[in-house]
Amino acid sequence: MEECKIINLYNLEETIAKEFLEKYTYPWEVLDGIGAYIVELGKSLPKEEYNQIGENVWIHKSAKVYNSAYIGENCIIGEGAEIRHCSFIRKNAIIGKNAVVGNSTELKNTILFNNSQVPHYNYVGDSILGYKAHMGAGSIISNLKSDKTLITIKNGKEKIETGIRKIGAMLGDNVEVGCGSVLNPGTIIGKNTNIYPLSSVRGVIPKNSIYKNKNEIVNKK
């Protein structure tokens, strides 16, 4: 599944986690190590640029964090990022440069690349969102199957048994997810793809495409 590889989904120059991600082939392989990597990386961040607040939390001095936001352990918030009113960052999150975490949005065990946005009523868990990826209002990522079984990544007749119980979605660079959509566990969306509002998405969606529904995925012209 070449289209699911990290190198084909993301421009690694657009994240502080570049060296970490380069060690892996597929994005779901990194999920178990995000928290430990944040602790390691945080200790090396320049003190003249970052404030350490709480347990293993580093916030760039140029970031804007609203007083009502909650930030749990093991987090790095990058330059110019905006953490808005009542956002809930549970733990293990890297928020990239100029990224936005919005009102009533919840994050957990997630990497947001630079300039990515989850600005309005979103849930993002066990996921990676690429450069300039954007989730519309009320769109959520489901990271656990209803029967609690291990997640399989499926693309037509191809499949990869991950051996992992919780995987959200992997959004490539410049992905746009329409309002009110649900990305089911293990969804992979290729670069520059648009998802129509109110969609229920699963499996691997090709890059440079428009997802209208499960039976209508067209290439961008």
Language-model segments: which ranges?
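Terminal amphipathic alpha-helical/low-complexity segments used for targeting or macromolecular assembly
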Residues: 1-56, 192, 198, 207-221
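Glycine-rich hexapeptide-repeat left-handed beta-helix
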Residues: 17-21, 109-114, 119-221
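Conserved hydrophobic/aromatic pocket- or pore-lining residues that grip, position, or stack substrates
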Residues: 26, 81, 110
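Glycine-rich adenosyl-nucleotide cofactor-binding module
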Residues: 47-60, 95, 99, 112
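Glycine-rich beta-solenoid repeat tracts in large extracellular/virion proteins
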Residues: 51, 70-71, 88-89, 106-108, ...
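ABC ATPase A-loop
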Residues: 52, 58, 76, 94, ...
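Short loop/turn microsegments at loop-to-beta-strand junctions
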Residues: 54-55, 60, 72-73, 91, ...
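Glycine-rich active-site/cofactor-binding loop and its immediate structural neighborhood
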Residues: 59-104
